């Protein structure tokens, strides 16, 4: 074994302690605000490093995606199985104005619906909203027994599945094309589209647990501050009142 100096050992004076720096001393808190589509707009808080030199805190925050439970945003436990994704688009003081970035089911809710003796039917469409957002919508449904059915299973044939998928795609395409992203999200909260899809397919095969399972944002238009402020209820479409113009008076004599 060679004996020599170990360069990795740092020489230090005895009695000196290493200075402990609090990592939170260089950070600051920001409040996350949800769009006015939801009842509770206070989502929570987030941390970011303070602006220093060429690094700006607002640039770091823009584009940050947070996830919130719809039950917290609506104040009702009936929506606890839905997760809403919000994207930070603008920084105003200590407030972060967000826009809708997507929606999904919780894993436990999705797994609890999958059972034996029934058929799982899924459909998806890629559509552009009226405000130029390209989204992909996923729908899910399960077959159920017919009234007074004795047979244990309720499997659907391939022709039934294709017909149900076609109806789902037509309804979702129509609803998305005729709505903005915020309007389409507001339709998902009371589950209006789910009931429409279930009623439209009851003549093909009886269904249960019909849901819009997921909404994925694929492409967004160019950022517009006015539309974001209107989404948060801070903008106005009023252009103002018309005022009478000033007319020059012509003097008869000079």
From Swiss-Prot:
It comes from the Eukaryota. Transmembrane segments: none annotated. One of its GO terms (biological process) is translation. Its main location: cytoplasm. The modification N-acetylalanine is found at residue 2. The keyword Hydrolase does not apply. It is found in: Cytoplasm. The keyword rRNA-binding does not apply. GO terms for cellular component: cytosolic small ribosomal subunit. It holds the Pfam family Ribosomal_S3Ae. GO terms for molecular function: structural constituent of ribosome. Coiled coil: none annotated. Keywords: Acetylation, Cytoplasm, Ribonucleoprotein, Ribosomal protein. Belongs to the eukaryotic ribosomal protein eS1 family. PANTHER family: 40S RIBOSOMAL PROTEIN S3A. Component of the small ribosomal subunit. Mature ribosomes consist of a small (40S) and a large (60S) subunit. The 40S subunit contains about 33 different proteins and 1 molecule of RNA (18S). The 60S subunit contains about 49 different proteins and 3 molecules of RNA (25S, 5.8S and 5S). This is Small ribosomal subunit protein eS1. The gene is RPS1.
